[in-house]
Design a protein with these regions (language model features):
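Negatively charged
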Residues: 1-389
């Protein structure tokens, strides 16, 4: 019996509900004739216990396999010989297919355009897919999200048409392969790309980032990353929020980056313990949020007096925990001249707000924040302001 798109779904539904009845009507699932099927998207969606041999299915006319095995927690069958030459969409295909780990290295992916979320939470998967043809793929976001064991060479992939690689290796804890030759000239979103990619430390300094607008959390918790990315073009980037958050080893010269369009640098170097580079030439004229930018970046003590903060509305704890941290007793190594340049005389109220919100006016080891006016008199506050301006 030849099945089409509609009858195949009916057959699968019956198989999951009553296997014996499905065999009576359609035969065993392993022998179904799927030669006329073009759409297998979501075919086994949420079939948590499905794990039958379907290796002989004819998929030569299938164009869509998106979400096919989504949430099939136990599925782990050999489907490596499937004909995928006409498939264009395989996004979410193995989403939450925790146990899937089969050889699909020979799949023809030349017509695939969307690989987003393909191995999302596919914990067991670690197969060689380095020879896949990805020349037509435009979306790879979250492709290996939480693919905890994946660490294969995919350095030769053609990524020339890819526009989105956000979250691609997020939580891919062991991934550490050379992808430095990837063509990224069309990529616009790199946010969270290596978020929690603990082992990744490869040279990606030659990437073309001229069209990227979002680099937020790109190296968040990328503990080992410390590569030269000084030549990246960042003139179109608007979001650098948490970019190097807890990137413990990172300490590279990025002082020549063009940051004129960036609006958020909040938590950018938060907990980046080793970072201590000169960024005094950065153009921060459009930045509105620098809260916790250098929070607990313990080694940072660079002169940032040239940074423009005229549009900044949030400086909460911008350098708290660094060598620049202010103490009321004056025993820190903070350079007062930096603050004098940052805040003009007519902005002394803003300066006080900056001190308080940033935690720079401690009282017996505690940040004053909203309670500062209850501890200091108006005269004391005035003295504090004038001592730095």
């Amino acid at each position: 019996m030849e099945l089409n798109n509609e009858t195949l779904r009916m057959a699968v539904k019956l198989w999951l509900e009553n296997e014996k009845e499905a065999i009576k009507q359609y035969g065993h699932i392993s022998n179904w004739n799927t030669s006329n099927v073009t759409d297998m998207s979501k075919l086994f969606h949420n079939a948590k216990k499905i794990n039958n041999d379907i290796s002989n299915w004819n998929t030569s006319n299938v164009t869509n396999m998106s979400s096919m095995f989504c949430n099939t927690y136990t599925f782990n069958q050999d489907i490596g010989k499937w004909n995928t030459s006409n498939v264009t969409g395989i996004s979410y295909m193995f989403y939450n297919a925790y146990n899937f780990n089969q050889d699909i290295s020979n799949w023809n992916t030349s017509n695939v355009t969307d690989m987003s979320f393909m191995f999302y939470y596919t914990h067991a998967f670690n197969q060689d897919i380095g020879k896949w043809n990805t020349s037509n793929v435009t979306d790879m976001r979250s492709m290996f999200y939480y693919a905890c064991k994946f660490n294969q060479d995919i350095g030769n992939w053609n990524t020339s048409n890819v526009t989105n690689i956000s979250y691609m290796f997020c939580n891919a804890h062991v991934f550490n392969q050379d992808i430095g030759n990837w063509l990224t000239n069309n990529v616009t979103d790199m946010s969270h790309m290596f978020h929690n990619a603990y082992e990744f430390n490869q040279d990606i300094g030659k990437w073309n980032t001229s069209n990227v607008t979002d680099m937020s959390s790109m190296f968040y918790n990328a503990y080992n990353f410390n590569q030269d990315i000084s030549n990246w073009l960042t003139n179109n980037v608007t979001n650098m929020y948490c970019m190097f958050y807890h990137a413990c080893e990172f300490n590279q010269d990025i002082g020549n980056w063009l940051t004129n369009n960036v609006t958020s640098m909040s938590c950018m170097f938060c907990n980046a313990c080793e970072f201590n580079q000169d960024i005094s030439n950065w153009n921060t004229s459009n930045v509105t949020n620098m809260s916790r930018m250098f929070y607990k970046a313990h080694n940072f003590d660079q002169d940032i007096s040239n940074l423009k903060i005229n549009k900044i509305i949030n400086t909460h704890e911008i350098i708290s925990g660094t060598r620049l941290h202010i103490r009321l007793d004056g025993e820190s190594c903070f350079n007062k001249s930096i603050m004098k340049k940052l805040f003009s005389y007519d902005r002394r109220k803003d300066f006080l707000k900056f001190l308080v919100e940033s935690g720079y006016i401690p009282y017996q080891g505690s940040c004053l924040k909203d309670s500062y006016h209850k501890i200091f008199s108006k005269e004391d506050i005035y003295k504090i302001i004038m001592s730095f301006i």
